[in-house]
């Protein structure tokens, strides 16, 4: 990792949790619109939809092409291997099993501790890089009920990270109180229809990692919970645009 990037970012710089999905791509555009220096971080934890990691480079390149200022602000990309997370998780995201709901109402796509681990490692990297702001795509408005996506969870973790690292990190969750339709609209607000098309074409959301089927909202199996949320959100976004 080049150390000079940390100096360029300073405390005004940001680190974005960037999976290659719709939400993280929108969050990256949001961060590029606000911070003078932005770095990205992806995680390989043995997820079935590992194809999302392959989309990250194309999304980063596409975002820099949309706005010269974004290109100047976009810094290095980092990837961390968290194989242990996948090894201890018996979920439909890390095992070849059918997606279903458990008795507690949570889908078996929930990876316990995933966002807690992601944000903790992100803070450790931000500490080294000299970056104060950490941006994630967590949301509790239009989501699958994951407890580590809740606003209370993120606020509590921010306190713990700052106490444990003696820093003043700020955890930003720009999608926390908006639904998928509004997330599509936010992308248009940030980068126009060109950004919406970039997210449609290059981002990946499908839990099964399906890239063979192209829909108006992007690629995916079309039936898993992630595809369902994305498709319905895109439909509502288009309907609102037409009004």
From Swiss-Prot:
Catalytic activity: 7-carboxy-7-deazaguanine + NH4(+) + ATP = 7-cyano-7-deazaguanine + ADP + phosphate + H2O + H(+)
Signal sequence region: none
Pathway: Purine metabolism; 7-cyano-7-deazaguanine biosynthesis
Name of the molecule in the record: 7-cyano-7-deazaguanine synthase
EC number(s) on file: 6.3.4.20
Residues where ATP binds: 18-28
Record GO biological process: queuosine biosynthetic process
Record PANTHER family: 7-CYANO-7-DEAZAGUANINE SYNTHASE
Binding note for cofactor: Binds 1 zinc ion per subunit.
Any GO molecular function: ATP binding
Function, as annotated: Catalyzes the ATP-dependent conversion of 7-carboxy-7-deazaguanine (CDG) to 7-cyano-7-deazaguanine (preQ(0)).
Top-level taxon of origin: Bacteria
Keywords from the UniProt entry: ATP-binding, Ligase, Metal-binding, Nucleotide-binding, Queuosine biosynthesis, Zinc
Gene3D superfamilies, per the entry: HUPs (3.40.50.620)
Family membership: Belongs to the QueC family.
Binding site for Zn(2+): 206, 221, 224, 227
């Amino acid at each position: 990792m080049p150390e000079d990037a940390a100096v360029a970012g300073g405390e005004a710089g940001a680190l974005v949790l960037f999976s290659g999905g719709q939400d993280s791509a929108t969050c990256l555009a949001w961060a590029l619109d606000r911070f003078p220096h932005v770095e990205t971080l992806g995680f390989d934890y043995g997820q079935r939809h590992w194809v999302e990691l392959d989309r990250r480079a194309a999304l980063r390149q596409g975002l820099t092409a949309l706005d010269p200022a974004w290109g100047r602000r976009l810094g290095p990309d980092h990837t961390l291997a968290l194989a242990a997370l996948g090894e201890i998780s018996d979920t439909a995201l890390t095992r070849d099993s059918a997606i279903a709901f458990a008795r507690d109402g949570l889908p078996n796509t929930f990876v316990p501790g995933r966002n807690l681990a992601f944000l903790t490692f992100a803070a450790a990297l931000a500490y080294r890089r000299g970056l104060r702001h950490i941006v994630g795509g967590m949301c509790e408005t239009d989501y699958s009920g994951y407890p580590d996506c809740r606003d209370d969870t993120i606020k509590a973790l921010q306190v713990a990270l700052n106490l444990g690292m003696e820093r003043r990190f700020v955890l930003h969750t720009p999608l926390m109180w908006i639904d998928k339709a509004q997330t599509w609209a936010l992308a248009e607000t940030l980068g126009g229809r060109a950004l919406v098309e970039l997210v449609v074409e290059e981002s990946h959301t499908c839990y099964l990692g399906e890239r063979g089927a192209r829909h108006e909202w992007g690629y995916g199996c079309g039936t898993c919970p992630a595809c369902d949320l994305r498709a319905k959100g895109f439909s509502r976004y288009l309907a609102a645009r037409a009004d």
